[in-house]
Amino acid sequence: MPPVPETLEDTGLSPEALVDLVLKTLYVQGARTGQQLTDTIRIPFALIDDRLLDLQQRQFVEVRGAKGHGRGGYTFDLTGKGRERAREAMDSNQYVGPAPVPLTKYREWVERQSIKGVSVSREGIEVGFSHLVLDPKFLDQLGPAINSAKSMFLYGDSGNGKTNLAESIARMMGGDLFVPHAVDVDGHVMVLFDPVHHRLLPEGRVNGSKSEEDWLEPVHAYDRRFARVQRPVVFTGGELTLDQLDLQYDSHSKVYQAPFQVKANGGVLIIDDFGRQRVRPRDLLNRWIVPLEKRMDYLTLHTGHKFPVPFDSLLIFATNLDPLDLVDEAFLRRIHYKIFVPSPTKEEYQKIFRRVCVSRQIVYRNEAVDWIYEHFYGRLGIPPRSCHPRDVVDHLCDYARFVDSEPVLVDHLLQGACASYFLDMPDGGGEVGAGVVAADANADEPAESGLDDPLATALSRAPSESEPESTASAVGGPAESTEP
C-alpha cells in the first residue's frame, strides 16, 4: 500500500503547491472545517494545518467558528485578501480535489503493481472460463497469451464471442490496485482516476487510539491520494480516434485528462472492432509501436514538453475482419499472440443451446438443433455462430408470448423464431446471411472450437521479414511460443 505521508516532503508537493490547493478549495467550496479540507485534499490534517497557520499569519485565511475540539474542527474561510490570492491560483489551473501525486511516484506504483506480476494456471483458466463452451486446445493458446501481459489479437467471424472472451479475461485476472486521483507533471495536473473505468473498493482503516487533535479524522492505512480499485478494464471500439491517445487539455480549467491507455495501466485494454475505427489500423499501430515494445508511452503537454508514462496493460485487439486486410505481416509480428476464434462445431453448438435453455427454464431437445441445422444452416448455407442459440431462444420466447403458448422447442415455434432472425437468402452465408448480432458481454455461452485458421496458412506462406520472428504464434492450434 502507498504509505501515508508523514511530512510535506513525503507528499512530493512544494509548500506553495499545497497552499494554492488549500486556497482554491476554500474559493470553490466556501468555508470548510479542517476535517472537510482533509477529506477533499486527502493528506493528513497535520500537514494541511501547517499551511493554514501560515495563511492565517499572512491574513489570507481566518477562523469563522469551531465544531468540537482541536483545529480539525475549526471552520476556515478566505479573507478579502485571500480571495484575491485564490483567484491568482485559479488562473494557474482550476483543479480542486485530492492532492496530485508526483509523476515519479506514479511510475513507481505502476511498476510495483505491474500486470506482468499476474499469472494464470491451467486449472485457474479452466475455472475462469467455465461459464463458456471452449475447446481445451483453445485454452492452451489463451493461457500463455494472458501470462505474457503483452498484446493479443482475437480474430474470426462476428458472433463467436471475441468481445465476451476479452471481457472474461479481464474478469478472470481479478485483483485490485492503487490508482492516484491525479498526477503532477512539472506543475501541471493530469487527472487519472475515472469512475467509468476504475471501480472503487472500500477504504481500509487502521485500528488504534486517536489523539485529541485528530479525533475527527479517520485513520487510513494508505495514502488517500490513491484510490483502491478493482483491476481496470478499459474498453473502446469504433469511436476511437488518434487524438484520444493523447492528453486531453481543457483550456478553461487548464487541467489535463489522462488518455484511456494510461487509465488502463495495471489492467486490460480492449480495442474492439479493430479496423472499423475512424483511424486507419496502420496509423493506430504506428502510434503504439514504441509503447508495445518498450512498455513506455510519451505524452505531450500543450507547452510542447514531452514526458514518459508507463504502458502497462494487457492489450487485446478484437476484429471480425481478415487481419491481412488490415495490416501487413510486419505489423502483425508486433502483436505477440494471434488467436483465431472459429465458429462452433455442432457438438459445441448443442452444448451452448442446452445451457441457454437451462437458463431460460426450457426443456432442451437435441432434435431442435437438428431441425435448425436442416432447415436453416443447411438450406440457406448460413454458418452457425456461437451467439445464435441465445438469440434463437430469445426469439422463440418472444414468439411464444405472441401466440399465447409455453416456450417449448417444437417445430412451429422454432420456425417462427428462426424466420425472423435468419435472413432467407439462398445464396447467403457471410455476415448478412448469418443474421448475427453482437455477442452480449453477459451472454451465457459464447464458444469457440478448433477449426482451421486461414491466417495461420497465410502467415506460413508469407516471405520472411527483416524483423525478428514473432515472439509467439497461437493460430489454429496450441500456442508455439518462441519467446526468450
What feature does the model see in each segment?
Residues 410-484:
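C-terminal engagement/docking regions of AAA+ P-loop ATPases
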Residues 28-40:
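Short acidic, hydrophobic short linear motifs in intrinsically disordered regions
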